[in-house]
Each structure stands twice: as structure tokens, then as C-alpha cells.
Amino acid sequence: MFKQKPLWRKPALFAGIIIGAVAFSCQQNTESPITGDSIEFVKFQSGDIIPGKYIVTLMPTGINFRKDLSYDAVQATMRKTGSELLSKYRIDQENLGFVYGSSIEGFAVSLTEEQYQAISKDPSIKAIEADRVIALGPPPGKGPGSGGGGSTASQQIPYGIERVHGGATYTGSKKAYIIDSGIDSSHEDLNVSTSLGFNAFTKGKDASLDSDGNGHGTHVAGTVGAKDNSVGVIGVAAGVTVIPVKVLDSRGSGSYSGVIAGVDFVKANATSGDVANMSLGGPISDALDAAVVSLAASGVKVALAAGNESDNANNHSPARANHANIYTISAIDSSDKFASFSNYGNPPIDFAAPGVGILSTVPGGYASYSGTSMASPHVCGLLIWGNPGNGGNAIGDPDGNPDQIAIR
């Protein structure tokens, strides 16, 4: 079902880095646990297995074919199913975390080793994998820049938007789901719909969908759809509605189980033709890949960052996930040169896009970031308009098979 790919050289997760006008706060925040859990992510490194936390995939129950069920109804049904399975093994229902029924069928759960050994033999279970921390981090050898928040004196068209032939104003009904750290809903350059969004966090400073405590998701959203409004920057599909799906907290940290919950929400609520961007990733997860493939199979086009490890993208999830509606994106610079940090490999990579020194929106202003996290939303914006075209080849692709540069 999936493109084959190897594990990362080290369990680092990928995203963009700050190289421009703003530096984000990364203070420890222990007040934003994943729903149903009590995880303090600061205790873990990116890619670490979270002790005692698991993602259970169930054998098909047929719930996905019951089109009459709303997202809330599916959630209730799967929570009942999960609770009944746990009670069968005398496991407390409070151990049950996120539940999934719109993409994969299953749930997140806390288990002792003894409970894991017992429940894993149940015939209703297809697979169990360890939950992991997922966190944003810089490409190898890079680090965050410094500086204060900034605004642009007048509207600019970033070089990446020009390179992919974006910037036209979108007036249709398609929506862009940004599966990330949230989006600053007050930003004057973005058309944000929080009422359609999802938040994996239920308390602390990350519980509000109106804010983005990290800034990464707001930057991604601006590349997709910043308005043509005489200020700031212009996105690839200017003015498109961007929807926050907050699965990363203010430190840029979350869990695989929370990311799957976000994907599950989008699968249940998006319309065929909508798009989604996932500028995040980590070690291989069959459950995460399966959820993303299910989302793509519903008609939602998904842009995925290839990763920043200078590694084969086949070693990472969800970058390795394969479907006709999935586009895995590597990064180039303003001279079309393949970025030194970018992951590579065909498959899974479908296109390259600008990902070095990308100016976009951040809470309170604008900043330049680098990473495949910045390349992916260029293609996400293109997918609003249709399938990307061929704008030439990336220069110096290390796999010897140059990635096509995506354009409208």
C-alpha cells in the first residue's frame, strides 16, 4: 500500500527553521497534555517512544461505510468499542485516549507491559505500535536565528510564490487544512476559520484555536494563502480559507496519536477537492501512514514535507505514504539548487519547491524560515488550483534523479 522507505538515521523530527525576522519562545510548557493523556513532552526528544503509550489499529468494523454517521457519532461509537475492548481485559476506561473511526479504526491507549501482552493477542486487533513524540526541529547543522518580530513596509511577493507561478486570488469554495501548530486567527493577512478546526490540546495556553504559540503553522498557512491586500506577503492561492488543525503545542511538540487524531478529523470533515498540508514527520509509523492514505483516498489532496535529514525520505512517516492524491515535497533554493538539508528519493518525492529563506506570516508579523516545511505549502497552495505542472528540474539532487519543480 505504501512506498517503501527506511528509518531515519536518528529519531529527529523535521520542520522549518528561523533564519529571518523573528525568534519564537521555546520555554517548557507542562500544561498542555494530549487529550486523554498526561504527557509532558519536555521530558522527551523528537522521535522518542512514549513509555506505556500505544496506538491500536483494529480490524475493519465497517464503520467507515456508514455515511449517515457524523464525526461526533463515529467518535462516540469508536470510544464505546475501545472501552468494551479494554474492559474485556480489566483495563480502566480512563486509559483510553484519542479514538479513530474516520481514517483508520482504532484508538490510543496507556498500557502496562502486562496489559500490552494480554490485549495484543485479541483477534479484533490488527496492529499495535508504540506512540512517539513528534516535534519540530531544524535541519542538520542549522539553528534558529535571532531578531525581533517584524512587519513588511508594503506587500511583497516572495520569490517562492513567483517561482511556482502562484499569487492569484482564489475565490472558490475549497479549503486548506493546516495540520501543524495552529494558525494566528488575528493575522490581517490570513483568512482563518477556527470554527472548522480541530485542537488536540484541551488545557493550558495551547487550548485556544485562535492562537499559534509556536508560529510554524502560521508561516505554513501564509505560504498557502496569504491575502493580496497591499500588506505583508501573497500566498500561492491568495485568500483561500485556511483551517487550523492544531496537533503541535507551543514548543512544536505533540504525539503521533495526536497527529492521527487531526488527520482523522480532516477525513471526517473535509470535502473532496479540499487540500491538507503536513509539514511534520518522524520515524516510520504504519498507523500514521494509513491514516494519511485514507484521507487522500477520500479526495483530499495532501502535501507532505519530505524532511530535513539529508536522508532518503522512504525512511520517514508520513513522507513515505503513497497515493495518487499525496504529494511529497523536497526543497530547493532561489537558484533551483537542491537544499543541502532536504530529504530525497523517488519515490516517494513527487516535486521540489522553494524551501530556503521563505518569507511568510508569523504571529505578530512576518519572518523567513527554511526547511521542507516551507516547500510543502507551496505545493499545497498549487493543489487548490489543480495538479502541479513541471517547472524544470532541481539542480544537484543527490539521488541522481532530479525532482521536478512544481508550478501552476
Residue ranges and their predicted role:
Residues K142-T241, G258-A261, F265-D274, Y327, ...:
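Active-site core segment of subtilase-fold serine proteases
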Residues S87-A153:
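Autoinhibitory propeptides
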Residues I234-A237, P244, A268-A291, S298-V300, ...:
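C-terminal subdomain of the subtilisin-like protease fold in secreted/lumenal serine endopeptidases
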Residues F2-K3, W8-P11, G16-D48, P139-G148:
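Bacterial Sec-dependent N-terminal signal peptides
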Residues T57-T61, V99, L111-T112, E129-V133, ...:
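Active-site-proximal beta-strand/loop segments in catalytic clefts of secreted hydrolases
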Residues K43-D92:
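Post-signal-peptide N-terminal segment of Sec-exported extracytoplasmic proteins
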Residues P138-G143, V233-I234, S253-V259, M278-D350, ...:
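Substrate-binding/specificity loop regions of serine endopeptidase catalytic domains
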Residues A221-V224, M374-G389:
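Short, small-residue alpha-helix embedded
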